[in-house]
C-alpha cells in the first residue's frame, strides 16, 4: 500500500421519514451503496493500520490504495453508521467533541444546522439578534438580513456560518449560539442533545463494535483563528484526550481539526508534534496520504450529501491516481 485516503462523514440520515429533512447528509441507503462500492475498489484499513503506515511499520507493497472511514462531530447519526459499518466488518474512527459529554451542550455548527433546518433563516436570525442584544454586542456590526424572494438561500447560510466562525470572537460565537440553542431548539425539543449528539452509552457501544474514538477538541473552535489562550488551547486540544481515555478506558491516538481547512489548523501541527499527545491528526484537505505526508496534517475527503457511490469512486480514484 503506497498510500491511503481517508473519508470524513458527518450526517448519516434516515432513508425515509427523516424528522429533520432539511439536514443535509448522506442517506442511510446511499451510505450502504458507498460501502459496497468502496470495498471493491479499495483496501479498507483501521486506525491502527493508518498509524502503522505513518510510522513505517506497514507493508507498503499492496497494490490497492487504502481507505479509512472517519466521522466528525460526535453526531447521534454516528450510532447508526457504526452499526452499519460493523455489518461489513469495517472499523472506523469517530471524532468526539467532549463538551457534549462533560457540559451536556452541543457544538456550534450543530446548533446552526438543526435550528436552520427546523425554523428557517428568518426565525433563526430573530433569535440571533436577541442573543446579540442580550450580550450587548453591537447588532449593526454583525447583522444579517434575509429576503426570501431575492436572496440565495445557500449563500445566506454560508454568510451566517462565516460570521460565527471568523467574525465574532469565539467566546461571543459560543455564548450567542448557546443562547439560541437554549431559547429556541432546546425549548421546543427537551431531548435536544439526544437528537443532535451521541450519548456516553452509545459511544461505549460503538467501541464495543470494534471502532475507535478520537479527539475533536472540547467545544469545536477553529484552532488557528480563535485566538485561544494557552489555557484554553490545552482545554481544547489535550484535555479531551485525557477525558476520553479516562472515561471510556481506551487509547485516543488521533485528533481531527475542527472545520479542518488550512486557516483552521495552521501552526497546530508543530504543537502536536512537540507535545506527542497524538500520533495522527486529520484535516479536510483532499489528498492521498503517502509516507511523505506529516502524520499531523493528514488529508481527508469530506463526503457531501450529493455524493453518489459513482461520484465518490471517481473522485477518490483521481486522488489516488489509480
Predicted regions span which residues?
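C-terminal active-site subregion of NodB/CE4 polysaccharide deacetylases
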Residues: 1-70, 76-77, 107, 111-115, ...
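Metal-dependent polysaccharide deacetylase catalytic core of the NodB/CE4 family, i.e.
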Residues: 7, 12-13, 64, 88-263, ...
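Anion (oxyanion) recognition and catalysis
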Residues: 39, 86-88, 207, 274-275
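Conserved beta-strand->loop/alpha-helix structural units within folded catalytic cores of enzymes
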Residues: 72-74, 78, 88, 92
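Short alpha-helix within the catalytic core of nucleotide-sugar-dependent glycosyltransferases
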Residues: 79-83
